[in-house]
């Protein structure tokens, strides 16, 4: 571990002890996380005694599921699941990669993140309840708000929150987990408390997953700030890591270019 990674580890240990952190999160989907980056995050996560969550590339992303199994992921999320049929494809893909025994240690959830998917809320929650492989829903507020034509600034507004609360009520009725993400910040604390009052299992920032009850904690704003600091350090670490790789052969490239110029003259 380098100095920055040790600082990231300290932030995660503090988050677990003081702010209700449950897991570190990465994405093969929107972030395009590479495997070497993923392994750095996994090491930090394990040393902090946290779980690890991974958003795969789609409902039937078999290779992503295989790599998730090899790495040892605790939460797997399928993005942009728009229909009950897509949800069945996700459950089938999980069953092909993870046998019944292996599924016991992993939670598989789908992202509900568009107004089109919400139109199928009842059927998709019923399908999730029926599928032995699946356990819940992740409500992605940013994409949902944009898909409904409301804009990103509406994520903490009444309209988007009402959609989340309806989803929460349905998940509670069926005994499903509900996780809320998308633009979670200190501005989200009041609406997170509303969600907890109905039904909420976890909420998440881009890189950190919290226990839902931490939304009611006195220092949740500090917990969210801590998560932002972690993400910033992660991005700086990622930038420097690839810059180092990019510079590895700089001297040899310079030498070969000069040699080529001499031989080609």
Q: Where do the protein language model's features map onto the residues?
A:
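Expand to "…catalyze enediolate/carbanion chemistry for C-C bond making/breaking, isomerization
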Residues: 1-265
């Amino acid at each position: 571990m380098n100095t920055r990674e040790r600082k990231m580890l300290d932030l995660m240990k503090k988050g677990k002890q003081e702010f209700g952190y449950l897991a570190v999160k990465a994405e093969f989907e929107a972030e395009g996380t590479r495997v070497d980056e993923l392994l750095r995050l996994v090491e930090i996560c394990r040393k902090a005694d946290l779980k690890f969550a991974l958003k795969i590339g789609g409902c039937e992303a078999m290779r992503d599921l295989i790599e998730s199994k090899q790495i040892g992921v605790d939460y797997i999320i399928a993005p942009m699941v728009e229909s009950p049929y897509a949800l069945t494809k996700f459950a089938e893909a999980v069953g092909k990669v993870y046998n019944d025994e292996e599924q016991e240690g992993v939670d598989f959830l789908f992202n509900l993140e568009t107004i089109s998917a919400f139109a199928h809320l009842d059927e998709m929650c019923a399908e999730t309840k029926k599928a032995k492989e699946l356990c819940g829903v992740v409500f992605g507020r940013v994409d949902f708000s944009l898909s409904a034509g409301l804009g990103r600034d509406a994520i903490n507004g009444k309209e988007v929150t009402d959609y989340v609360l309806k989803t929460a009520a349905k998940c509670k009725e069926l005994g499903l987990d509900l996780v809320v993400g998308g633009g979670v910040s200190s501005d989200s604390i009041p609406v997170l408390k509303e969600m907890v009052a109905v039904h909420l299992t976890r909420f998440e920032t881009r890189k950190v997953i919290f226990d839902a009850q931490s939304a009611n904690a006195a220092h949740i704003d500090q917990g969210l700030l801590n998560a932002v600091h972690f993400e910033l350090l992660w991005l700086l670490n990622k930038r420097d890591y690839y810059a180092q790789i990019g510079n590895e052969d700089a001297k040899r490239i310079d030498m070969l270019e000069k040699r080529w110029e001499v031989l080609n003259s």
